[in-house]
Amino acid sequence: MFVYVNTPLVVMIWQNYDDNLFIRLGQYLASGHWLGPYSQFTLMKGPGYPAFLAANYWSGLPITFTQGLFCCLALAALSLVTFRATRSRLVALAIFVVPLLDPRVFEVSRVLRDCIYFSQSILIIAVVSYCLFLSNGIRTRLISAIIAGALFGWFWLTREEGVWLLPAITVLGLFALLRKKRYSEACKILPPALIGTGAFVLVLVLFATINFFIYGMFIGVDFKERNFQAALSAMESVQIAKPIPYVNVPRAARAQIYAISPHFAELRPYLDPNPGPSPWEAGDCLHRPTACGDIGNGFFIWAVRDAAAKVGVYKSPKDASRFYKAISKEIRSACTKRQLRCVKNFVPYMPRMTRSQIEQIPRSAIELLRDMVHPGMYSKFADGHVTGPKDEFRSALDFLNYPLHYPISNSHFTAVAIRGWYHDPKIGDQWFSVTVSDKGDKALPFTLIRIASPDLVESQHDENATQQRFSLRTQCGAGCVLHFASADGGTRDVAISSSTALTAQYLPIGSGLLVFDSGAVENEATVYDDGRVRLASRIRAVLYPIFEILLPVLLGLGTLSFFGGCYMAVRKRNYPIILAVAAACWVSVLTRSVILVLIDVSSFPAMITPYLLPIYVLSVVASILSLSVMRKRWTFVDQTGTATQTSDTSCVDG
């Protein structure tokens, strides 16, 4: 918790499709205005994380503390299940502590849904396991089923690819059936399964129902809306002579679609402006060279939505749905009439791949495996990228309850106050001019006051030097410089560093003399000066080499132990709870890995920490559980919690 809370947050308020979107939706929820006025952004992504942000705002706790606490609670729940199943305090403690020490958990220091997504997956596996294996009595079992279903509904509305956790839940159900000796006992699993499913469906129906009353359409996340997906599928089905990797709807295909689809042609000024390139063309170019000069798969969906919003499509969900339905219908009709050459894509939600992309699957899988085993070295986030309007930045910080954060790049955290005098005997009482600048602004505001100077009349023997003293005050940020200019064209720049550098300074400017009698530079304390942040950074730096050694051993032995445990379980027909939970975790790792590899080779780079976090944590948990299964002497625990020792290598039975 200390490291999590004291890892500064990077508040990217310019990220309208991620960080700022979640903050804005959360602010609407917290103020009681649902998800706000309808636009292309309103239902673009699920409200799971904005709801968490809203709840955090009401709690008054910094968002980093709440997210860290949620991670601890999820691991504590799984640790409790582990203890109930094994009666081993050591294994339960390892389940709680080792994932928390994984330095990769702290890498996502942004306002992203991925910060809670891995915790949600752990908590769901823990609650489902408790419901199926450890709950005593019908009432407890049904309540835990409702909680599990509601959690899965929340999980489903947090990211769009929640299907990857379904196989893990199925595995837990299969183990529960295998552990039942009689048909009548197996039937007892059905009621909680149905109730949990009902709670899951109820969450989704409730979300769509509220959208119906607020926005006029029974709809969930409109990214998955039927007509929107049909339109995308229709666009991607249009073929050109030579397919371009990572560009399923290239400019040549768009030109053909414009010709036969009046509705899609409305988007042409924004997708393919004339003259000039589309602003979306640069998005995929850095990582996908074949996409340079065109709109790559990773950005095409957002480009279409953005263009549709600019032509007024997103007045309501119904208007947007009708628009995309018309595009789909026009393209399908042209395909049927052979006006377009089309090939149907039979894999929903996944762009079509060329042969060269398919050949990249092994490379992507190896990269994922390498990232799992080797955490790399500690690298500080590029905090200098925090930019945006200051009022929005302050509003976001207030909503997030002021966590430790990197300051905005154009923050004025240096206060400068100078007192002195200026005299030029050649020009009498004429005055100098001054401007103030820093890295973010070339013309900062300042206050310059002329003060009576009878002492200078006498000391300089100039009867015109009656108002030559001054007081100068300003605020600036990094790279602060004072630019002085005299009436005769002389200039002098003074870089602000410390009060000492401004005191008793004599600066010739042209034919005049500028004197600083005293100067004060007060730097507002920032995250860079916080000892807690420096300590947390050192702890993270120490953890990376430790896990660089630990992970290959832990994951390697964990994998072998899992297969050994499965072999023993099948041979003895004894299916312990701990093996069931380990299997669920390993299956989750596998299914999410498959999804990320397919995304990586078909669309945008997916081997990044935010997407990989569930794999990182679940693989560590699965390895620890698998190792506990293969102990020399197995603890045999019955449903009542009584533990006995066996002389052979039997499996743990909860």
Please give the residue ranges for each predicted region.
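Transmembrane-helix signature of polytopic, membrane-embedded enzymes
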Residues: 76-103, 119, 138-143
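Juxtamembrane membrane-water interface segments immediately following transmembrane helices
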Residues: 9-23, 196, 200-377
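Transmembrane-helix motifs of polytopic, lipid-linked glycan transferases
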Residues: 62-87, 123-127
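Membrane-interface alpha helices of multi-pass inner-membrane proteins
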Residues: 144-159, 200-202, 207
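Membrane-interface anchor segments at the N-terminal boundary of transmembrane helices
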Residues: 59-66, 329, 334-415, 519-585
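Aromatic- and kink-enriched transmembrane "portal" helix at the membrane-lumen/periplasm boundary
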Residues: 6, 47-54, 60-64, 96-119, ...
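Basic, ligand-binding patches in group-transfer machinery
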Residues: 412-525
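Extracytoplasmic catalytic/substrate-binding loops of multi-pass membrane glycan-assembly enzymes
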Residues: 8-25, 34-52
